[in-house]
Amino acid sequence: TVKGLLKFFNRYFSKDKHFCGKLSSMLGYTPAHLELYVQAFKHKSNSVEVNGHRQHNERLEFLGDAILNSIVAEYLYKKYPNGDEGFLTKMRSKIVKRKTLDAIGARMGIDDLMTIMNKTQISRSMLGNALEALVGAVYLENGYAFTRKFIVLEILRKYLDIHDDIELAIKHMP
């Protein structure tokens, strides 16, 4: 298939093959549309102009933020069928807040991918934004159902101890 050929080319012959190898290890698959992921890790301070438009990760970050919020809300809704709106909102807020996403991004190795794609110093506060942009890229390439599975299996279950967060949230409930 064409998608299979693109994946093969990206993995072995692309000028970004080092980036593609690290990205593939993180994602668990080789992306066919590598340019989406290159853009996801391109910070605005290191943007380039293509056809009169600056290329950086902010638009993908916007999209990924919305998708991440939606999927986390659905996940919590299903996982805690007796949780009221306040509890579910607090839990979602704890998961998608900048500090949490920055920490997840660091644990995932997003800083390594950003270092490859940027010539500027990478700060920890950029990692959560890049994680959201990554979610946006995964969504554009693979659709909602795949992205939901990716977020639940590769982010929520792998990098968050939601049970500890639940205990903490319960202790602070009125």
Each PLM stretch: what is its role?
Residues T1-P174:
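Double-stranded RNA-binding/processing signature
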